[in-house]
């Protein structure tokens, strides 16, 4: 069986392979948990090198149903979902016990990253994200969702 390559790459990481010291050891990517900022920056640089992308959008996740459309790397927006049509822009979601959702519509060129916590899920974060994607040209029949 040959799998057709997708033009959108969806990546999940684990906590191994980075430089953060305990209790954040070792591949912590969150800059909001008390880890050494230099370690987080080094881990993020390592991720960028591994996947070959340098432009990221990291969210300030607040357990809301807020969806933000982005078109360039930026300081973390206060949101729980980011959507873009910009090629080469990586959208990042951080989770511990929440569900990360990575969405794409290859034909429309729309991607999204969603932080689906209990409150956001109850308040339709996924539905709001899909609506936002559709407002940018995405169609339900060509959308792909990967749950982490």
Task: Give the residues covered by each predicted segment.
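Structured loops at beta-to-helix junctions and adjacent beta-edge loops in soluble globular domains
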Residues: 14-16, 62, 86, 148
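Ser/Thr-centric signal marking residues that sit
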Residues: 13, 84, 129
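Residue-level signal for beta-strand positions within conserved beta-sheet cores that form or flank
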Residues: 6, 55, 141
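Phosphate-centric recognition/catalysis
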Residues: 37, 41-117
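N-terminal basic/disordered segments at the start of proteins
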Residues: 1-11
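Surface-exposed, charge/polar-rich loops and edge strands
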Residues: 90, 98, 105-148
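Short, glycine/acidic-enriched capping/hinge loops at junctions between secondary-structure elements
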Residues: 22-27, 69-71, 124
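Intrinsically disordered, low-complexity, positively charged segments
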Residues: 10-46
């Amino acid at each position: 069986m040959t799998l057709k390559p997708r033009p959108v790459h969806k990546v999940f990481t684990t906590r191994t392979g980075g430089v953060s010291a305990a209790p954040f050891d070792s591949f912590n990517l969150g800059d909001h948990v008390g880890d050494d900022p230099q370690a987080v920056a080094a881990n993020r640089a390592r991720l960028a090198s591994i996947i070959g992308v340098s432009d990221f959008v990291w969210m300030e996740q607040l357990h809301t149903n807020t969806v933000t459309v982005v078109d360039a790397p930026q300081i973390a927006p206060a949101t729980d979902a980011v959507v873009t049509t910009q090629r080469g822009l990586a959208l990042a979601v951080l989770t511990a016990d929440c569900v990360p959702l990575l969405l794409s519509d290859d034909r429309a060129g729309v991607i999204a990253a969603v932080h689906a916590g209990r409150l956001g899920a109850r308040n339709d974060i996924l539905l709001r994200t899909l609506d936002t994607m559709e407002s940018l040209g995405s169609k339900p029949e060509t959308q792909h969702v990967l749950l982490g």
